[in-house]
């Protein structure tokens, strides 16, 4: 899994829809070596998963790492970021996106909170991870599959929902 997911992600990146300038960011929990870890997730206004970052601590440095990696991979700096009222987000936004409007509301993030359920549903039978790199890689792979399944790629936008993954996997496998 660690070997092929980065290759699939790289192959799918050129078919990715442009990322929007309004992001919703939140964290959820996952088991990491018997302890709870924080899985930061960012989605844009269309529901496309922008990036995922797993950290053992809920700090401003971890949130800043999510923003920096998302900006580096997508090339998009968000104009507006909606988060919950966690204290780690304002200092994390200052350096990478100083001009972004930061809105805090527990109700504006309902779409992202609902989106966490898809990841949690897949993680529950797995009973957690042993290493942070495994959790991060799996979460990124899950985000890739979720974006493809939701039609957020030029490969899947005209394919019926039930056939999207079956249509895309052979194309991505050839690109590796």
Question: Could you tell me what each predicted segment is?
Answer:
Residues 33-49, 59, 67:
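Short conserved beta-strand segments at catalytic cores or DNA/RNA-binding microdomains
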């Amino acid at each position: 899994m660690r070997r092929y997911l980065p290759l699939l992600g790289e192959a799918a990146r050129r078919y990715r829809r442009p990322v929007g300038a309004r992001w919703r960011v939140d964290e959820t929990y996952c088991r990491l070596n018997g302890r709870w870890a924080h899985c930061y997730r960012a989605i844009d206004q269309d529901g496309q998963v922008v990036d995922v970052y797993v950290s053992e601590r809920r700090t401003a440095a971890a949130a800043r790492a999510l923003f920096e990696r998302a900006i580096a991979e997508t090339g998009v700096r968000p104009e507006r970021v909606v988060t919950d009222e966690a204290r780690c987000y304002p200092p994390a936004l200052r350096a990478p996106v100083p001009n972004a409007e930061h809105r805090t509301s527990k109700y504006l993030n309902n779409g992202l909170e609902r989106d966490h359920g898809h990841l949690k549903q897949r993680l529950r039978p797995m009973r957690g991870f042993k290493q942070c790199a495994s959790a991060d890689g799996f979460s990124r792979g899950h985000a890739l599959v979720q974006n493809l399944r939701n039609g957020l790629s030029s490969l899947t936008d005209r394919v019926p929902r039930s056939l999207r993954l079956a249509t895309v996997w052979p194309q991505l496998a050839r690109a590796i």
